Amino acid sequence: MFRGATLVNLDSKGRITVPSRYRTTLNEASEGQMVCTIDLNQPCLLLYTLPEWEKIELKLAALSSMNPAERRVQRLLLGHASECQMDSAGRLLLASTLRQHAGLTKEVMLVGQFNKFELWDEQVWYQQIKEDILAEQTSQEPLSTRLLDLSL
């Protein structure tokens, strides 16, 4: 399980260095084999271990290519999916098309989200957090049953 937000640098070759606290888990889960794709709703990337991504691929394969919405999701997620191998120094090379999609420049936020990471441009991440907090503070919508059961 991945949690927390960490600032990492994107080097001139388009690589990020995975924080050491995650490396053992990633090596045990997938021998450092990762898959990165776009997020359909946010300007960020999604980074999965290969076994986690394979679960998603099975779900995507079950969608109908005859349904335009389902085909669109398949095209976007699978079409942007890029395998990346963590090297011995803990670095991952991110495809240039993915970096461009998320607007990643020098400083990147690596955000743990249970079974995956999100990769955000640092400034976009902090702006999104401000917007999310404001939305929660001003929301008039009733909480879902699942959120009502959440006790912090």
Curated annotation (Swiss-Prot):
GO molecular function (one): transcription cis-regulatory region binding
Localisation per UniProt entry: Cytoplasm, Nucleoid
Coiled-coil ranges per UniProt: none
GO biological process terms on file: negative regulation of DNA-templated transcription initiation
Keyword flag Kinase: no
InterPro entries: MraZ, MraZ_C, MraZ_dom, MraZ_N, MraZ_sf, SpoVT-AbrB_dom, SpoVT-AbrB_sf
Keyword set, alphabetical order: Cytoplasm, DNA-binding, Repeat, Repressor, Transcription, Transcription regulation
UniProt xrefs under SUPFAM superfamilies: AbrB/MazE/MraZ-like
Segments passing through the bilayer: none
Cellular component aspect of the GO annotation: cytoplasm; nucleoid
Domain of life, source organism: Bacteria
PROSITE patterns: SPOVT_ABRB (PS51740)
Residue ranges occupied by any SpoVT-AbrB domain in the UniProt entry: 5-52, 81-124
Gene3D superfamilies with a match to the protein in the record: Transcriptional regulator MraZ domain
Entry function: Negatively regulates its own expression and that of the subsequent genes in the proximal part of the division and cell wall (dcw) gene cluster. Acts by binding directly to DNA. May also regulate the expression of genes outside the dcw cluster.
Subunit structure: Forms oligomers.
Record family assignment: Belongs to the MraZ family.
Protein name stated in the entry: Transcriptional regulator MraZ
Organism of origin: Proteus mirabilis (strain HI4320)
Classification of source organism: Bacteria, Pseudomonadati, Pseudomonadota, Gammaproteobacteria, Enterobacterales
Gene symbol of the encoding locus: mraZ
